[in-house]
């Protein structure tokens, strides 16, 4: 209390000083003048201008559908970016499971195929696949000319939908190279890539996904493929099989029935990491195919089913590998969960968790059986592209006719494919859906194989499909590209010699 009294006494004493009173007065006067100027500006200029602008420009009414379309477009683009990111997974998977002397070749082919896909899918591929024409091919919208701002009834911006579907086409193109690693010429790869992304994929894909595709509109029970077990993976896997047949096996590849076995992968860590990146990208592949961020129930169900099928497939392949060899096989487990992802891609919207679990188990089994079948038939598939994508895709397509739960449908602007409830055999739906799925899968498989064999042997006739024996023994990295992914090694034939730099021994000197 005494301290407060002393401070008050000092203030009273200072206030008696006329110089201090003058300074305080000037300070308050300046503050008052500044405040009056600000108030004048606000009341005489800023406020009337703002009120006048508001009265002259009425607030536009919010269009609810415009907001919905914007949200759905953003969701589709996010999914597209995830799917495109799968290219990283593909090149790592292929490079890791192949030999080291082919790693640069795999990456260059992956980049070149992506660029070819982008150009061809813009010029005519998208028109062939997604625009109206007839039941077999689209005939409008070449180079995206004359098309509306949004695609169909989805409300998604057309260019965003194109980016999403370009990523799908690029996935199919990348799958095709998997069984051809190690002996396919680079020029031959470029030639058949044009045929795949420019013709085979979009034309046959139109049958299932085009607005008037004959598979999508056949009979009272149509063929269904939600995110591409058939359209993307079966087509890609079948083309890969045709390429492996046309090329023949790699030099030095001896099959089990002849006393040999698969050539070892050069880096299983890279390969398995690539597989996990692919799994991550699948969360754009399947959930993004709803094309609707507001279909929250569908997105959640698709994401869950995708996860569960991959897990059950991976466990199945892992356990099966141990039963057969008493070893826990990393490569087989990786291909196992990938086959589960491929299989669930078609039915993921229409099945419940129980169905997804068993579809994944089926995927884990068929991929092992498929690898054994190729080995017996002496077909060289270095990474298992055919069992994972072709056989896994066929199984997933048929599984819809067995496990569709009969209670999921989305009467929203997400396309006719998910607007109808689908019921499988095991849920009381009879054989109708299974028949439709069998017809669609069989037709696509046979048509793709015929077209792919014609394409591969056509490219082979040019002399560019397979490299020379000398080039294959040298390694595609050096032979085709003049570089190596591992510059500290000299790759020559089947041997690798590490290069060392001599270092002066100070102690010996």
Question: Which role does the model predict for each range below?
Answer:
Residues 9-24, 253-266:
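Cytosolic juxtamembrane amphipathic/interface segments immediately preceding
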Residues 45-49:
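Short, composition-biased linear "edge" segments at structural boundaries
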Residues 1-8:
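Short, charged cytosolic
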Residues 54-509:
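Glycine- and aromatic-enriched membrane alpha-helices
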């Amino acid at each position: 209390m005494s301290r407060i009294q002393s401070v008050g006494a000092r203030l009273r004493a200072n206030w008696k000083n006329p110089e201090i009173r003058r300074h305080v007065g000037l300070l308050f006067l300046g503050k008052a003048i500044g405040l009056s100027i600000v108030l004048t500006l606000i009341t005489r200029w800023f406020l009337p201008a703002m009120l006048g602008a508001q009265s002259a420009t009425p607030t536009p009414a919010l269009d609810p559908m415009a907001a919905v379309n914007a949200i759905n477009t953003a969701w589709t683009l996010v999914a597209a970016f995830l799917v495109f990111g799968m290219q990283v997974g593909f090149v790592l998977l292929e490079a890791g499971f192949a030999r080291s002397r082919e790693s640069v070749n795999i990456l260059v082919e992956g980049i070149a195929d992506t660029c070819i896909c982008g150009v061809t899918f813009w010029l005519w591929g998208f028109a062939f696949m997604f625009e109206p024409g007839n039941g077999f091919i689209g005939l409008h919208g070449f180079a995206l000319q004359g098309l509306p701002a949004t695609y169909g009834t989805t409300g998604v911006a057309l260019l965003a939908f194109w980016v999403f579907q370009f990523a799908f086409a690029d996935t199919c193109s990348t799958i095709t190279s998997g069984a051809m690693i190690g002996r396919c010429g680079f020029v031959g790869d470029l030639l058949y890539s044009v045929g795949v992304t420019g013709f085979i994929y979009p034309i046959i894909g139109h049958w299932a996904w085009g607005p008037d595709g004959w598979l999508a509109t056949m009979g009272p029970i149509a063929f269904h493929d939600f995110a591409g077990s058939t359209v993307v993976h079966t087509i890609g896997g079948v083309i890969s099989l045709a390429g492996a047949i046309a090329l023949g096996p790699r030099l030095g590849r001896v099959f089990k029935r002849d006393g040999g076995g698969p050539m070892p992968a050069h880096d299983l860590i890279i390969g398995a990491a690539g597989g996990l990146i692919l799994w991550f990208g699948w969360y754009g592949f399947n959930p993004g195919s709803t094309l609707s961020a507001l279909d929250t129930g569908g997105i959640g169900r698709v994401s869950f089913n995708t996860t569960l099928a991959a897990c059950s497939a991976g466990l199945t392949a892992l356990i099966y590998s141990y039963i057969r060899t008493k070893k826990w096989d990393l490569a087989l487990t990786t291909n196992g969960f990938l086959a589960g992802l491929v299989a669930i891609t078609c039915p993921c919207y229409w099945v419940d968790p129980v169905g997804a679990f068993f579809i994944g188990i089926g995927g884990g089994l068929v991929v092992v059986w498929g690898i054994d079948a190729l080995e017996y038939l002496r077909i060289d598939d270095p990474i298992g592209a055919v069992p994972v994508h072709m056989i896994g895709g066929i199984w997933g397509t048929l599984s819809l006719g067995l496990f569709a739960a009969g209670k999921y449908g989305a009467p929203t602007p997400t396309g006719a494919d998910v607007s109808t409830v689908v019921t499988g055999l095991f849920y009381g739906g009879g054989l109708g859906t299974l028949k439709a799925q069998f017809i669609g899968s069989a037709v696509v498989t046979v048509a793709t194989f015929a077209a792919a064999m014609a394409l591969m042997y056509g490219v082979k006739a040019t002399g560019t499909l397979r490299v020379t024996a000398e080039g294959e023994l040298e390694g595609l990295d050096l032979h085709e590209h003049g570089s190596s992914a591992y510059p500290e090694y000299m790759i020559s034939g089947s041997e690798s010699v590490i290069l060392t730099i001599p270092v002066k021994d100070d102690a010996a000197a």
